[in-house]
Every structure is written in C-alpha cells, then in structure tokens.
Design a protein with these regions (language model features):
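Metallocofactor- and cofactor-centric catalytic cores in central/energy metabolism, strongly enriched
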Residues: 1-87, 101, 111-114, 122, ...
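Short, surface-exposed amphipathic charged segments that create phosphate/polyanion-binding patches used
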Residues: 28-30, 83-90, 134-139, 161-163, ...
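A polyampholytic, Gly/Pro-enriched intrinsically disordered region
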Residues: 32-41, 89-95, 138-151, 166-168, ...
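Short catalytic-loop micro-motif centered on adjacent basic/acidic residues
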Residues: 45, 70, 91-94, 120-122, ...
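Phosphate/pyrophosphate-binding betaalpha-module
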Residues: 93, 97-160
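A conserved active-site cap/scaffold subdomain adjacent to cofactor or substrate pockets
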Residues: 142-192
Length: 192
C-alpha cells in the first residue's frame, strides 16, 4: 500500500502472475494428489504447495488423511529422502518459473549420477513471456505497461520480452522488488 500512495492519480498497479504456486492448475494438483494417495509414494514439495487446491482436495488435506507429504527447502533434499526410504517412490513436485529450472535440472542430474531409481519429477514449469502474451491476448482490462521481473530477466535477458512493444505497443521495464526499483521502472515506462 505504501508505494501506491506515492504514485500520481491515474496510475494503478495490478499484480500479475508472479507466483508459480498461484498459477498451478487443478489438473496438475489432481495428478499430485493421485500420487499422494498411493501407499508406496512420498510427495516431496515446497511448503507453499500444501494448500493449493485440486478439483477435489489439497495436499494438506491428503496429509491429514495419512498421505506422506514431505516439505523440502531445496530440491536436492530428494536425494536424502530417496536414500532414507529406498522402498518408496519419491515424487518431487517441480514447479516454478525460469528461475527454478536450473536447480531442478541440477537435481535431475544429481539423481541420475547417484543412480537413484526411486525419484520421480512431476514437472509444471511456467515461462513468463508466454504468460504476458496470454494476458495481452485476453485483454481483461487495459494494460498500459509491464514491470518485468528482474530475477527472471537475469536468466532469460530482455530479448524474450521484445514482442511486448513490437506486437502490442506496450512499454515495459525490468526491475527488482525494492520500492525504489519499482518507482524507477514506473518512471521509465511513463517515458516510453
């Protein structure tokens, strides 16, 4: 709320699809729940996935009913789980945007290099540029500009966003999450 008070009237900030958990669909969650319901399976996931709803339940509800859901803080923890429970299938819920793809790939390689046969990955990575295109194609409301995520942009660069101005005539600016960076990005967008 603090930044909004600093902005002149006529400028409205709208949060976009920045959280992979928030844009994880029910189909993916239903697949995860189907695995969670198996007695021979341990679901390894980040804690924020526990309350994401599927069409009929959530991981936290499945856990309350006896499913083994293990909250991890880094994907590499699946290796420890695999060794601790060799008789179980470890299914890691691999979600995220461009920023998490590298660490997931490193985990896949580490699992392969360790010869572990009981680790599986249920993957649902999202890409920011197609999400932005989908927002513009839907035209739900009017979008005058995009503040682009700095952490994703460090990985993909600025070129994948070129379509915003070329195809849609929508200005954009890459920024971090700090208040001053966001204000600078807004000023940059207004000048374009």
């Amino acid at each position: 709320e603090g930044l909004r008070q600093l902005l002149p009237s006529g400028i409205e900030l709208v949060s976009g699809p920045g959280c992979p958990v928030c844009v994880t669909d029910q189909t993916y969650m239903d697949k995860a729940l189907a695995y969670a319901e198996r007695e021979d399976t341990i679901i390894a996931t980040f804690g924020d996935m526990l309350k994401v709803p599927g069409s009929y339940s959530s991981l936290s509800e499945a856990q309350a009913k006896g499913a083994y859901i293990h909250v991890i803080y880094t994907p590499l923890e699946v290796i420890e789980l695999s060794k601790k429970y060799p008789e179980k299938k470890i299914v890691f819920l691999a979600i995220g945007f461009e920023t998490t793809i590298a660490v997931i790939c490193a985990t896949v390689k580490a699992v392969h290099d360790a010869g572990l046969k009981n680790v599986f990955f249920l993957v649902s990575h999202k890409l920011v540029p197609p999400a932005l295109r989908a927002l513009l194609d839907r035209q739900e409301g009017h979008i005058d500009g995009f503040i682009l995520p700095g952490h994703v942009s460090v990985i993909i660069g600025e070129e994948p966003y070129g379509f915003l101005s070329k195809e849609y005539g929508v200005p954009s600016c890459i920024a971090g999450f700090d208040g001053l960076e966001i204000l600078s990005a807004i000023a940059n967008i207004l000048e374009q």
